[in-house]
Design a protein with these regions (language model features):
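Intrinsically disordered, low-complexity segments enriched in small/flexible residues
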Residues: 1-50, 58-61, 219-231
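Glycine-rich phosphate- or other oxyanion-binding loops that anchor nucleotides, phosphorylated ligands
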Residues: 65-67, 80-87, 105, 119-125
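Conserved catalytic cores of soluble enzyme domains
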Residues: 109-224
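Short, basic, glycine/proline-bearing loop/turn elements
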Residues: 41-43, 70-79
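A structural preference for short, pocket-lining loop segments at secondary-structure junctions
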Residues: 59-72, 87-111
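A generic structural signal for short coil/turn motifs at secondary-structure boundaries
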Residues: 76-80, 112-115
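General structural feature for long, well-ordered alpha-helical segments within catalytic domains
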Residues: 6-9, 40, 84-87, 91, ...
Length: 231
């Protein structure tokens, strides 16, 4: 499993100086008045160097123009709150309006518990944005890294036209111990790994980090849709 920051992953995939971040002005607020949440957010900003758990923008990968989003796992475990959901929704809306594909890199523990039902609502919001993008015939490549769990798995992360994962990444909804306790069964050692998901048809391929730039560029080039903007 390869541990990289959100920006490291975008820079690695992108052509030199190609990435332009957008929607960075959207910031978290304590809408439910959860005690200590503002302080927690400030600590996470200082620790991660990011303002939120996801970065979105426009880039090119071997000359192929695309929208991109990437989760920052060191910001509250890459959890999806209202800001992450809003930014993912907006990047898909931008891609749909501008006839661009989307490359998404997920490293998330799931919905952010401090935002309660507002966090869970982001599952529907992001899934709807992906659907509108797909309805226009545009391409979405989803890259699952360790971990991809909970609300991320149950929404946008598993809706790619092509879904790939890094070796040995944990991919699932509930955690292993929860599943074992609820099912009263002993699960296989490879349960919820990328290899398990590939074997059972939930993902399309396993691609090591070092091979992703070539792979993603090839997928973008060979999955162009009619009318797609490559300028």
């Amino acid at each position: 499993m390869t541990k990289k920051s959100a920006r490291e992953r975008i820079v690695y995939l992108s052509d030199e100086n190609a990435f332009s971040e957008i929607f960075s002005e959207i910031l978290s607020s304590n809408q439910l008045d959860i005690e200590g949440y503002e302080e927690k957010i400030e600590k996470e900003k200082a620790k991660s160097g990011e303002n939120e758990a996801v970065i979105v923008g426009i880039t090119s990968i071997k000359g192929e123009k695309t929208c991109v989003f990437s989760f920052e796992p060191s910001f509250m475990m890459g959890s999806m709150g209202t800001v992450a959901g809003e930014k993912i929704g907006k990047i898909f809306e931008y891609a749909t309006s501008n006839d661009l594909p989307v490359v998404g890199i997920t490293a998330s523990g799931g919905a952010r518990m401090q935002e309660g039902i507002l966090s869970l609502m982001q599952m529907a919001k992001t899934a709807a944005a992906v659907k509108k993008h797909s309805d226009k015939g545009l391409f979405f490549l989803s890259i699952l890294t360790d971990p991809t769990m909970g609300g991320a798995t149950a929404s946008f992360a598993m809706l790619g036209d092509v879904i790939i994962a890094e070796p040995e990444s944990r991919i699932g909804f509930a955690g292993r111990r929860v599943v074992e306790r609820m099912s009263k069964s002993v699960l296989s050692d490879d349960f919820q790994t990328a290899e398990f998901q590939l074997k059972n048809g939930f993902i399309d391929d396993i691609v090591p980090y070092e091979e992703q730039r070539e792979y993603v560029a090839f997928m973008l080039k060979t999955n162009k849709k009619k009318g797609e903007n490559n300028g």
